[in-house]
Regions:
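N-terminal assembly/interaction segments in proteins that build large macromolecular machines
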Residues: 1-312
Length: 312
């Protein structure tokens, strides 16, 4: 309907109609700049030794699932792979049909009335790359590159990347900033839990249910409902303050650090791809690294990429 309307306004001039749609797209982009583009289409493709993922984002799943929208995403990805583009800025300038990719997106925005934007462009280059579109739903795509040719292993690891969303290939690939942040979180959580344990023990000794006084809101509500007497409420506040402060002041730094280090090790195991528990094996539990070694003693992951529009 919008295309027909543009043609009518352009008196049958296709070039003028396209320009009208492009102008509408620009107006929509400006007007709806604060809108969320949480839906869209994510595609992945490999041609010879070059593979890429790209996402074209929009506002609704109705538009995202439309054949024209998916085709536009596919056309842009084809152009990117043909040009072996390495950045999203490069992709936006590539010819798609009779316009550049960004103009084609803007024109489609003018047709649908929704804000649209390109995102998530990433590439892998070289041999032994496997690509995966999760359930062929075009919302989550992955790519994995191995150091040896093993399509089955590559495909399974690509599924692993989709399912378990690793943050890094291995521990050495985790940024120092992430390690520092995770260790700080682990230390804070350990201190909090040890203090809470001491406070709860003191509350129970005083005959007070810790669940009834875990927040000031609960203390007030449970006092009104008769679960606590005013005296118990005041005693609970006093215990939480004094015991909490005393315990926090006497925590053993070495013990705290050891527990936090254990938590950091758990973070690496759960979030580093090679250390994750392999989800697609046939027998005993094994890590991804162990699975690869069972296929070929020198088989390793060179690199991986993952992009999704789904909330996780």
């Amino acid at each position: 309907a919008d295309v027909k309307k543009a043609l009518t306004e352009a008196e049958g001039d296709f070039d003028k109609a396209k320009e009208l749609l492009r102008e509408r797209g620009l107006a929509i982009a400006a007007k709806r700049s604060d809108r969320e583009t949480s839906n869209g289409c994510v595609l992945v493709k490999k041609v010879n030794d070059f593979a890429a993922i790209i996402a074209l984002k929009c506002e609704t799943d109705f538009v995202a699932n439309g054949a024209d929208f998916i085709k536009l995403t596919s056309d842009i990805l084809d152009a990117a792979i043909a040009a072996k583009a390495h950045t999203l800025d490069e992709v936006k300038t590539l010819k798609v049909g009779d316009a550049d990719a960004q103009a084609a997106v803007t024109q489609r925005s003018g047709i649908t009335g929704e804000k649209m934007e390109l995102d998530g462009y990433c590439v892998l280059e070289g041999d032994n790359i496997e690509v995966y579109d999760h359930m062929n739903k075009h919302t989550l795509c992955t790519m994995v590159q191995l150091n040896e040719n093993n399509e089955e292993a590559g495909h399974k690891v690509a599924m692993q990347v989709a399912a378990m969303r690793p943050v890094a290939l291995d521990e050495s690939s985790v940024s120092e900033e992430t390690k520092k942040t995770e260790l700080e979180v682990a230390v804070a959580k350990t201190k909090e839990e040890l203090v809470e344990k001491a406070v709860n023990a003191a509350l129970k000794k005083a005959g007070i249910n810790p669940a009834h006084v875990d927040s000031e809101e609960h203390i007030e509500t449970n006092t009104k409902q008769g679960w606590l007497t005013p005296e118990q409420a005041e005693e609970a506040r006093n215990i939480k303050k004094t015991v909490g402060e005393e315990k926090a002041a006497t925590l053993n730094p070495t013990m705290i650090q050891n527990i936090a280090n254990g938590r950091l090790a758990k973070f690496f195991k759960e979030n580093c791809l090679v250390d994750q528990e392999f989800q697609f094996g046939d027998g005993d539990k094994q890590t991804v690294a162990q699975y690869l070694a069972s296929q070929s003693k020198d088989l390793k992951i060179v690199a991986y990429q993952r992009f999704t529009l789904a909330a996780e």
